[in-house]
Amino acid sequence: MKRAFFLVLLLAVAAGPVLAQESGDPELTIAVEAFRKALIDPTQVNLDKLTMNELTYGHSSGMIQDKAAFEQALLSGASDFVSIDLSQQTMHVVGNTAWVRHLFSAVTNDGGKPGETHLSVLMVWMKQKGQWRLLARQAVKVVQP
């Protein structure tokens, strides 16, 4: 009996990441992809549509921006993404709130200075009036081998 219990427990733990990935919402997946594209080609309209007024946007450097500062950095070119690749994405929806985790690799040209970044990102989304909008985002640097 103990053996069966531990086998079930092991299977439940192993299935956790798979279940989290499958508990997403197709509309949320579309919103995350739209946000990725908006970071590369930002406009006031697409950023406003995808983010909440209460946005808190945490960078891996420790800098935290509100919505206005986040948008200003993108629209001015101070933060300039040439390309972005998201991988190992998982998501979980709880009511009208969801979290999304992924690895974020980007080629940048911040203020005209070429570079690249590799991050682990956690995003919190809320569904308002049938649309997913970003409420919070926090990134940490990923050490590359």
Which ranges hold each PLM region?
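A beta-strand edge to alpha-helix "cap/lid" segment located at domain peripheries
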Residues: 21-49, 56-145
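Sec/Tat signal peptide C-region and signal peptidase I cleavage site
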Residues: 16-20
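Sec-dependent N-terminal signal peptides
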Residues: 4-14
